[in-house]
A protein has these predicted regions:
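Flexible loop and strand-edge segments within Gram-negative outer membrane beta-barrel domains
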Residues: 106-113, 117, 131-181, 186-212
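Residue-level signature of outer-membrane beta-barrel architecture
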Residues: 90-92, 126, 171-175
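Short strand-turn segments of transmembrane beta-barrel domains in outer membranes
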Residues: 26, 43, 55, 60-90, ...
Length: 217
């Protein structure tokens, strides 16, 4: 996953969130992360046209040897905050797979500040040889969030219900002096957003937005 910085905006390479112009961090599964690389300055040659200001490259873990690995983590804190995540990785010969799921929630430190999120990710890969490999993945996240507004002038019913999904398929080759890839991707989303209103005010319009984005690379 690569985040390209364009001025003050930030977009995932090949995974645009066109409604708000930025990626949804809640969609990432942290247990898959091996390391995070931060590149300053233009990097469009390697990471696409959105990497004009720099790149945040999230490198996912890879199984180097045959076997099965399963990890789980859970955390609980203030304001009834719960964070859970589980992952399973398999490698057998040329085949590899990754499946993860997460659930997070909190009541928030104020009334009408609840947040709840479900997320899942799956990836299948096949290595034809040392130079060529094929892989496909899918990532889905759904969350509900409430915004209470300013403490002295709170919002009522300023709620969002958002579902975002992404799937991609890629054929890659890596040689000593060259590398290449042919990739296809599809993004979709559904957003139910209530702008809310202040006490004594008028209810605003409920927006129901569906979008998708198809591309190749």
């Amino acid at each position: 996953i690569s985040l390209g910085l364009v001025g003050s905006e930030m977009c995932i390479r090949d995974r645009y969130m066109g409604l708000m112009g930025h990626p949804i961090a809640d969609a990432y599964q942290t247990m898959l992360t091996d390391r995070v690389e931060v590149l300053r300055g233009p990097a469009s040659v390697l990471y696409g046209s959105n990497a004009m200001g720099g790149v945040i490259n999230i490198v996912t873990r890879k199984m180097q040897e045959d076997g099965v690995k399963t990890h789980a983590q859970i955390g609980y804190g203030s304001y009834n905050t719960l964070q859970t995540e589980v992952s399973n990785r398999i490698r057998k010969g040329s085949f590899s797979s990754v499946v993860t799921g997460s659930y997070n929630r909190t009541d928030g430190h104020r009334d009408n500040m609840e947040f709840e999120q479900y997320g899942g990710y799956a990836k299948l890969g096949y290595d034809f040889n040392d130079s060529w490999k094929l892989w496909g993945d899918v990532n889905i996240t759904q969350f509900k969030a409430s915004n209470p507004g300013e403490a002295g002038n709170p919002y009522i019913d300023n709620d969002s219900r958002i579902t975002r999904g992404m799937t991609s398929l890629a054929l890659e080759n890596h040689y000593e002096k060259s590398s290449g890839a042919l990739s296809f991707f599809y993004n979709w989303g559904r957003h139910k957003i209530n702008d809310g209103y202040h006490p004594g005010g008028t209810c605003r319009e409920l927006r129901n937005i569906e979008l998708c984005h198809i591309g190749t690379g």
